[in-house]
Amino acid sequence: MVYKIFTDTNVHLDFLLQRGTEWKEAEAIFELAGNKEIEVFSSASSLLNLVYIMGTYKIPKKEIKNYGTAILSYTTLINPDNDVFKKALSSAFDDIEDAVQYFTALQAEDIDYFITSNIKDFKKASSSLPVFTPKQFMEQYNK
């Protein structure tokens, strides 16, 4: 079975900046995607957030562009629509941006897991789309 996962912005940042305790698992996820062993989805707004945040770390523009190009080689971008924003704004999520990411993933067809490093921000997520950290996903994948 080829898993379809939706990655939150922070998973990309953890991998790129080698930050947090699970950046190696994030790296493993993107290696699987590069090898076509899993399918990765993310939102267009997530990529924009990533580019902006990378700029605040003073990462050279050329490196940002190269990373963006690499992401697009193994990630399918999904655009949130009006319904996604309406659901996010009326949801119990504390952070609207997190809600937009989650409801964008729900809108997509057949996403198996939502992957985020900030799992505590997704406690109000529905049970129809499980939320995993990169480590939890890799444990599930390797079963």
Question: Which residue ranges define each predicted feature?
Answer:
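Short, well-structured N-terminal submotif of metal-dependent ribonuclease cores
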Residues: 1-42, 56-62, 132, 137-143
